[in-house]
């Protein structure tokens, strides 16, 4: 078991384990009710057993189940959850339990931030990808025009991983999770004393068991170093958006056919090409191809620009990218250069 304390406006622990020992460490008597929010996929795998375990610690456990997939990160779904909470009798002493992947963490976390002007919540992630979104307190839903356009900063009371639940992830979900983990690996050389960038180019076709407690802890420590310095993204927290400018645009243009972490992988190749680092771009591209990352259904360049101009990092109408040079920079990039990069990357995939 690994415990990583996060210093924030509301401090909390991230616990990584191969079982649910964390349950015995929570003071459940503080809460009038436990409200589990999950999706249909996680519900089918773990919902009943997880709620049964919680019922051993608290007499009042209710649940809400939404459709799996990013389409559930919406205002309409949020409104439905508020209605369910009111029907359940959830009050301001209710604890929301976000039980699922990154979509559930974002949705349930934002629900916690607005339900009755704010109730506590914990994250119980079930995916590799969620090691990023579960830490740091960013919660949001999507708008049809932009991803994560409606949200807030709202820290959880704890983040609790049982990594045995990762055993049921598909190969695509593992690839997607490695997208965010690779992002943290690239950032590690700038924020930690040692880099683990070279360690993560794994052959996913080998089916060898991985020590996920150790791997996730390494990624979370990178995020810890950044968010403890800049909790509300006034400075270096923007570094965590490496790969996300083009990645988010790609997700939106593809109507979320490409999972978030795979979109970030594409976005990091794009960002490396923007900065002129073809060596790292090609190494990542080759790894993506050898591990069958979902290819892009290329659309006209303007479709992606329409999405990138709504990115939250932008200033005064200029599209900005997080770029990894000798230091990490956040730079405005001209449309002409972005189009050249787009055509270069498209050419790599089409050859």
From Swiss-Prot:
Transmembrane segments: none annotated. Keywords: Amino-acid biosynthesis, Aromatic amino acid biosynthesis, Cobalt, Cytoplasm, Lyase, Metal-binding, NAD, Nucleotide-binding, Zinc. Zn(2+) binds at residues 180, 244, 260. Its EC number is 4.2.3.4. Signal peptide: none annotated. The keyword Protein biosynthesis does not apply. Its main location: cytoplasm. It holds the Pfam family DHQS_C. One of its GO terms (molecular function) is metal ion binding. GO terms for biological process: amino acid biosynthetic process; aromatic amino acid family biosynthetic process; chorismate biosynthetic process. It catalyses: 7-phospho-2-dehydro-3-deoxy-D-arabino-heptonate = 3-dehydroquinate + phosphate. Pathway: Metabolic intermediate biosynthesis; chorismate biosynthesis; chorismate from D-erythrose 4-phosphate and phosphoenolpyruvate: step 2/7. Its cofactor is Co(2+); Zn(2+); NAD(+). It is found in: Cytoplasm. It is an enzyme of class 4 (lyase). Gene3D superfamilies: 3.40.50.1970, Dehydroquinate synthase-like - alpha domain (1.20.1090.10). Binds 1 divalent metal cation per subunit. Can use either Co(2+) or Zn(2+). It comes from the Bacteria. GO terms for cellular component: cytoplasm. Belongs to the sugar phosphate cyclases superfamily. Dehydroquinate synthase family. Catalyzes the conversion of 3-deoxy-D-arabino-heptulosonate 7-phosphate (DAHP) to dehydroquinate (DHQ). HAMAP family: DHQ_synthase (MF_00110). This is 3-dehydroquinate synthase. It comes from Exiguobacterium sp. (strain ATCC BAA-1283 / AT1b).
